[in-house]
UniProtKB/Swiss-Prot annotation:
Name of this chain's protein: Glutamyl-tRNA(Gln) amidotransferase subunit A, mitochondrial
Enzyme class: ligase
Protein origin, superkingdom: Eukaryota
GO CC terms, sorted: glutamyl-tRNA(Gln) amidotransferase complex; mitochondrion
Active site positions, chain numbering: 79, 160, 184
Species for this entry: Aedes aegypti (Yellowfever mosquito)
Protein biosynthesis in keyword set: yes
Length: 494
């Protein structure tokens, strides 16, 4: 009979150490669970042969008392926009349906070197352009908290890293990689009731992450607990010669005390007034207020702060996003890279038809909009101005962090909406709502973490977001760990 797997990485590692569980049997259970939960559509593909081969090696290391790390033998998942050697990497798009990389993304490679076991590649919005994981060529992903097999209307998982969030929430994986351009890790983490973390830009290598918006893309981490998130972060952070945007200084792993020993006395918590916005649900507002009160009762001081350019941020983000998308998508021409049409009348027609077949409407619209903003007559009016306002948004954060140590905000404006409701609005309008609270952190390059707090009246997760100054990850994790211990979120783990 299968032994129920533990909830946390530390517990799993201890089971391996005492040999009450071994990596092979744990992996077999995980693969069985993934098979039972196929209706969630969290995975584009699983890799059972690779996973079991990795588990055999991990089992040998544990038996000899030489595990590589806390992650040795832990099942993980990787979003399908990170390159994995010998395994299809599709970005959930027809354009890359048959793409098999010859190398690994740095962040996955570092996890593998720490002994983590790859269960499979997770579903996403095409190229990461979405906030629901609803437009993949492999079909939408269903939120684990409210999914009934065969039911056509379900709660969305959030996006674009929805598959990774569901893989973690359902217990298939202990951790998963996502990407975060405007909230694509934190948004699904919020809806699925898991921890979602976006680090300071440059602390995690983007090598092998198929680019969407180079100036904002960062790898993200999804786990069930703050400690697990920190363990993964410690394993993959640090400079990478293959990515010139990584910080060149040595990364010192972060350690935290037990939650009971964390003291918040003297901590200054900022509450941005602009985040009390249109569409914010009463339940999220109440949760936000209660956690602020909880922090104050623990000795922290809570202060209203202003981030004046918040209202402009979503529009500036949209312009810059589309401009960089137009540039990045130019490489997919059907000649050297990506889907190739059967058209052979001319090179121009081959190029046009390959792109028409390989991209969905969302991608095409962003390419067209981006190229419009980049036209010579529009460049100064849109792109240059957007860059200037982005600097003002970053300055907002700089000023706020001169007054406070950390910011507390909603992650999403409500609990997870139904699929039928979500698709009533087009992708652009949905992103304007779904990314409102999350994309400013990408614009400023600062670290941010989404933490599940409680369940709504619909028995769905409600989460809040913490943001900290650049390179203040330790402070972020410390406060998150303290809150986690106080709220004791009710998990729905298998």
């Amino acid at each position: 009979m299968n032994r129920r797997l533990p909830l946390k990485l530390k517990e799993l590692s201890e089971c391996f150490r005492t040999q009450t569980l071994d990596p092979v049997s744990a992996t077999e259970q995980i693969l069985q669970l993934a098979n039972r939960l196929q209706h969630l559509n969290a995975f584009i593909r699983t890799s059972p042969e690779k996973a079991l081969a990795q588990a055999e090696k991990s089992s040998t290391r544990h038996k000899t008392g030489k595990p590589l790390s806390l992650l040795d033998g832990a099942p993980i998942a990787v979003k399908d926009n990170f390159c994995t050697k010998g395994i299809h990497t599709t970005c959930a798009a027809r354009m890359l349906e048959n793409f098999v990389p010859t190398y690994n993304a740095t962040v996955y490679e570092r996890l593998a070197r720490n002994g983590a076991i790859l269960v499979g590649k997770t579903n996403m919005d095409q190229y990461g352009m979405g906030s629901g994981t609803v437009d993949s060529i492999f079909g939408p992903t269903k939120n684990y908290w409210d999914a009934v097999e065969g039911e056509s209307d379900f709660r969305i998982a959030g996006g674009s890293s929805g598959g990774s969030a569901v893989a973690v929430a359902s217990g298939i994986c202990f951790a998963a990689l996502g990407s975060d351009t405007g909230g694509s890790t934190r948004n699904p983490a919020s809806y699925c009731g898991v921890v979602g973390f976006k680090p300071t830009y440059g602390l995690l290598s983007r090598y092998g992450l198929i680019p969407l918006v180079n100036s904002m893309d960062v790898p993200g981490i999804l786990t069930r607990t703050v400690d697990d998130c920190l363990a993964v972060f410690n394993a993959i952070a640090g400079p990478d010669d293959r990515d010139s945007t990584t910080i060149k200084t040595f990364f010192k792993p972060i350690s935290l005390p037990d939650a009971s020993k964390i003291c918040l006395k003297g901590l200054k918590v900022g509450i941005p007034i602009e985040y009390h916005c249109e569409g914010l649900s009463d339940e999220v507002l109440t949760t936000w207020t209660k956690v602020a009160d909880m922090l104050e009762d623990a000795g922290a001081s809570v202060h209203p702060v202003s981030l004046p350019y918040t209202s402009a941020s979503i529009f500036v983000y949209s312009i810059l996003n589309q401009c960089e998308v137009a540039s990045n998508m130019a490489r997919y021409d059907g000649i050297e890279f990506g889907h190739r049409s059967d058209e052979d009348a001319s090179t121009e027609q081959l190029y046009a038809k390959s792109r028409a077949e390989g991209f969905n409407g969302v991608v095409k619209n962003r390419i067209l909009s981006g190229n419009f903003f980049l036209l010579r007559k529009n460049y100064d009016k849109y792109f240059e101005k957007a860059l200037k306002v982005r600097r003002l948004i970053a300055n907002d954060f700089d000023r706020a962090f001169q007054e406070v140590d950390i910011l507390l905000t909603p992650t999403t404006l409500s609990d997870a909406p139904r699929y039928s409701e979500f698709i009533q609005s087009n992708n652009r309008d949905q992103c304007a709502v779904q990314d409102f609270c999350t994309q400013p952190a990408n614009m400023g390059g600062i670290p941010a973490l989404s933490l599940p707090i409680r369940l709504s009246e619909q028995r769905l997760p409600i989460s809040l977001q913490l943001m900290a100054p650049n390179f203040s990850e330790k402070r972020l994790f410390k406060v998150a760990k303290w809150i986690e211990e106080q709220v004791k979120f009710e998990t729905n783990y298998n």
